[in-house]
C-alpha cells in the first residue's frame, strides 16, 4: 500500500553500551530518520543480565508487551541471541522480513546464550541456520570472529610477548572464544602461554594491574567486559567502564 506508515524494530541482544551494537544501530537510525513513512525503534535485550530461563521469559514478555500496539513491519536482530525470539515473533507479528546480524551461522536452544552458562554446554547442540530458511523470512549477515587475525598481528607487533591474556566477560560468545583462542594458540604458537581473565567484580583490580603494568612480555586481548553489580538499593547495575579507569 503506497504511503502506508511502516515500523522498523531493532532488537539488540546486548546492552546499549556495547560498541559493536552501536556501530550497527546508529547508521540504521541515521538512514531511516529522514524517511517520513518509517519509524525505527530500538530495544535492548541486555543479555549480560540473562542467566536463567526466568529472566529470559521476563525479557521476552517485556518486549512483546511494549510493542503490542505498534507491531513492527520489519526487524533487525543484532546478535544470535535475539533470534531465539523467532517463534514468538512469528506467532504475534507474523512472518515479517528479518535481517539477522550475528557472529555464528548457527542457532541453538535459548539456554545456550545465557550469560555464565555451564561450561559443559558444547557446540554439539547448535544447528545450521540454513535449516530454518523454509520456516522464517530472514536474511543472515555474518560478522565473523577475527581472533586468528588479531593474534597473528599481536605476535608480529609484540615480538617479546610470552603470554596472551584474554580479558572478557561471561557472555556466551566469550566462552566459545575462550575455547577457540586456546586451541589456536596451542596449535600455532605452542611457546605462548594463554590466560583467561573473566570480567566480574572480583577481577576488577586484576584487570587494572594488567593494564597499569607496562610489561612487553604480556599481551592483552579484549572482548566485551560487562558485568552486573547491585547498587545501594539492591538493584542490578551494569558495570562497563573498568578498562577506562586506566586506559
Question: Where on the chain are the PLM-derived regions?
Answer:
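Short hydrophobic alpha-helices and adjacent helix-cap/hinge residues
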Residues: 1-247
Amino acid at each position: 500500500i503506497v504511503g502506508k506508515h511502516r515500523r522498523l524494530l531493532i532488537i539488540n541482544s546486548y546492552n546499549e553500551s556495547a560498541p559493536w551494537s552501536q556501530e550497527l544501530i546508529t547508521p540504521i537510525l541515521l538512514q531511516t530518520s529522514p524517511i517520513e513513512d518509517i519509524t525505527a525503534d530500538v530495544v535492548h535485550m541486555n543479555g549480560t543480565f540473562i542467566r536463567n530461563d526466568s529472566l529470559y521469559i521476563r525479557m521476552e514478555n517485556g518486549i512483546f508487551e511494549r510493542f503490542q500496539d505498534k507491531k513492527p513491519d520489519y526487524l533487525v536482530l543484532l546478535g544470535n541471541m535475539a533470534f531465539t525470539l523467532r517463534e514468538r515473533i512469528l506467532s504475534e507479528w507474523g512472518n515479517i522480513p528479518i535481517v539477522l546480524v550475528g557472529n555464528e551461522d548457527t542457532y541453538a536452544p535459548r539456554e545456550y546464550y545465557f550469560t555464565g552458562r555451564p561450561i559443559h554446554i558444547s557446540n554439539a547442540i547448535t544447528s545450521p541456520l540454513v535449516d530454518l530458511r523454509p520456516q522464517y523470512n530472514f536474511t543472515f549477515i555474518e560478522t565473523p570472529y577475527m581472533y586468528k587475525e588479531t593474534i597473528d598481528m599481536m605476535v608480529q607487533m609484540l615480538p617479546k610477548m610470552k603470554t596472551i591474556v584474554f580479558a572478557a566477560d561471561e557472555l556466551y560468545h566469550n566462552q566459545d572464544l575462550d575455547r577457540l583462542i586456546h586451541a589456536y594458540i596451542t596449535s600455532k604458537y605452542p611457546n605462548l602461554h594463554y590466560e583467561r581473565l573473566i570480567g566480574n567484580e572480583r577481577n576488577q583490580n586484576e584487570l587494572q594491574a594488567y593494564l597499569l603494568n607496562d610489561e612487553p612480555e604480556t599481551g592483552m586481548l579484549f572482548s566485551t567486559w560487562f558485568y552486573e553489580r547491585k547498587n545501594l538499593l539492591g538493584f542490578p547495575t551494569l558495570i562497563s567502564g573498568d578498562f577506562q579507569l586506566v586506559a
